[in-house]
Amino acid sequence: MILRSAYHLKEADPHSFAIPRLRGRAKAALVEIQADEYGGGREPRMHATLFAQSMRALGLDASYGAYVGLVPGVALAIVNMMSMFGLHRRLRGALVGQLALFELTSTLPNRRYGNGLRRLGLDRPEATRFFDEHVEADAVHEAIAANDLAGSLVDDEPALAADVVFGARAQQLLDQRCSEYLVERWSRGRSGLLRGGR
């Protein structure tokens, strides 16, 4: 939870920068995804709010940046990449590719995280709702992100195809590097957090 807090406590925000930088079907698809991320306009249903609830249910500080000193650079690189893509209009294709890959690959891990919390005796909605919501929402977002967002962007602006692929591959590479870092640390009986965690 601490490792992912830098991402999930502001999850949708960098992608919102792309809304005015897209047009047509791709823009509509991104707005549809973002509307879900922001809870359909209801703060208690915002995904960042749900993640904060999960953190608090586990006794963690849910304020943004509370653990940034414990999060390794390989995990922060994902957050920085999203922000960089979102802040530069010329990288809008890369941001779309990053988001599409994230949505395509998040349902199964979120199901596992939720089930893991339940196995640990944390079968309380405030602990698992974020993960359960992502299983449901991202199952829908998969098709929207792949076809309506990335597919439409490439159809309408073929010159951005390489950027979309770059964004997806960058997300995949950083996810892989983060996973390798964690497995290596855990295999030696160490925390994935810097300074051994709290």
Model-predicted regions and their roles:
Residues 1-198:
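Non-heme di-metal
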